[in-house]
Swiss-Prot record:
Gene3D superfamilies: Rhodopsin 7-helix transmembrane proteins. Odorant receptor. Keywords: Cell membrane, Disulfide bond, G-protein coupled receptor, Glycoprotein, Membrane, Olfaction, Receptor, Sensory transduction, Transducer, Transmembrane, Transmembrane helix. Belongs to the G-protein coupled receptor 1 family. GO terms for cellular component: plasma membrane. This is Olfactory receptor 52N4. It comes from Homo sapiens. It is a multi-pass membrane protein. Residues 1-27, 78-101, 163-198, 261-276 are extracellular. Residues 49-56, 123-141, 220-239, 298-321 are cytoplasmic. It is found in: Cell membrane. The chain crosses the membrane at residues 28-48, 57-77, 102-122, 142-162, 199-219, 240-260, 277-297.
Length: 321
């Protein structure tokens, strides 16, 4: 009788097929993807440079924005370059271990994106509800600790994805109808029981996004109460304006995330696979692309710094708000 070792059921590599059903148009799809990726790289690197270089931006709000920019850079860079290689050069192979690494980085930093947005909501809550204590509550050590905790939360919750995926037997081929290695997309190629993978994936989603959304909702509920109680219309308008960019970032992040998550689990037979794959990529591209634009347009301090640098002002380091 022929017996198979466990290693015989683990493929050496997967073949990423890109966007299923749209193979003939993938070259055209690559242009908006590439454009968004370039904007994301330039915008987020520019924000990181500004926050590091400008003394005026050495404040808690901008430290959290730097965390968001770094997270966005890693999040989109973990998938989009490979997707462009698939679209342009038909380089579809990805090693099994390389696939697990991509899976780890993608899911870890999407979780961290949500965590940083939650921290930014808490930052706005402290700034509006406790303005006199803002700098004493959100000190540099506190910011470093909560940022590290958010990163470790993602790492510790996502590491089991790689082990659960590696333990599965794969006897349904190695062709993956996707542009990157998503946890459940890879697990569905297995001929084993993926119930544990599905349940754990749902638990992680609830622990990360459920907790973060609850904190964001509570923060903005208290912000709304504080703002409404202000006697001056100008003060209310100014307080709301400080939250506009963050609210836009939340919308850009959570809208495609929820669509991708629920369509993958509950709308598989309703929503075309091509639509799901495109949204899954937009989910990783839209926040990194739009966040620098929104914060650049809505935040006066960042606009002023950019204008002074572009105008060649030599007094950028000494400028204070």
């Amino acid at each position: 009788m022929l017996t198979l070792n466990k290693t015989d059921l683990i493929p050496a590599s997967f073949i990423l097929n890109g966007v299923p059903g749209l193979e003939d148009t993938q070259l055209w799809i690559s242009f908006p993807f590439c454009s968004m990726y370039v904007v994301a790289m330039v915008g987020n690197c520019g924000l990181l440079y500004l926050i590091h270089y400008e003394d005026a931006l050495h404040k808690p709000m901008y430290y959290f924005l730097a965390m968001l920019s770094f997270t966005d850079l890693v999040m989109c860079s973990s998938t989009i370059p490979k997707a462009l290689c698939i679209f342009w050069f038909h380089l579809k192979d990805i090693g099994f271990d390389e696939c697990l690494v991509q899976m780890f980085f993608t899911h870890t930093f999407t979780g961290m994106e949500s965590g940083v947005l939650m921290l930014m909501a808490l930052d706005r809550y402290v700034a509006i509800c406790y303005p006199l204590r803002y700098s004493t509550i959100l000190t540099n050590p506190v910011i470093a600790k909560v940022g590290t905790a958010t990163f470790l939360r993602g790492v510790l919750l996502i590491i089991p994805f790689t082990f659960l995926t590696k333990l599965l037997p794969y006897c349904r081929g190695n062709i993956l109808p996707h542009t990157y290695c998503d946890h459940m997309s890879v697990a569905k190629l297995s001929c084993g029981n993926v119930k544990v993978n599905a349940i754990y994936g749902l638990m992680v989603a609830l622990l990360i996004w459920g907790f973060d959304i609850l904190c964001i909702t509570n923060s903005y509920t208290m912000i709304l109460r504080a703002v409404v109680s202000l006697s001056s219309a100008d003060a209310r308008q100014k307080a709301f304006n400080t939250c506009t960019a963050h609210i836009c970032a939340i919308v850009f992040s959570y809208t495609p995330a929820f669509f991708s998550f629920f369509s993958h689990r509950f709308g598989e037979h309703i929503i075309p696979p091509s639509c799901h794959i495109i949204v899954a990529n937009i989910y990783l591209l839209l926040p990194p692309t739009m966040n620098p634009i929104v914060y650049g347009v809505k935040t006066k301090q960042i606009r002023d710094c950019v204008i002074r640098i572009l105008s060649g002002s030599k007094d950028t380091k000494s400028y204070s708000m």
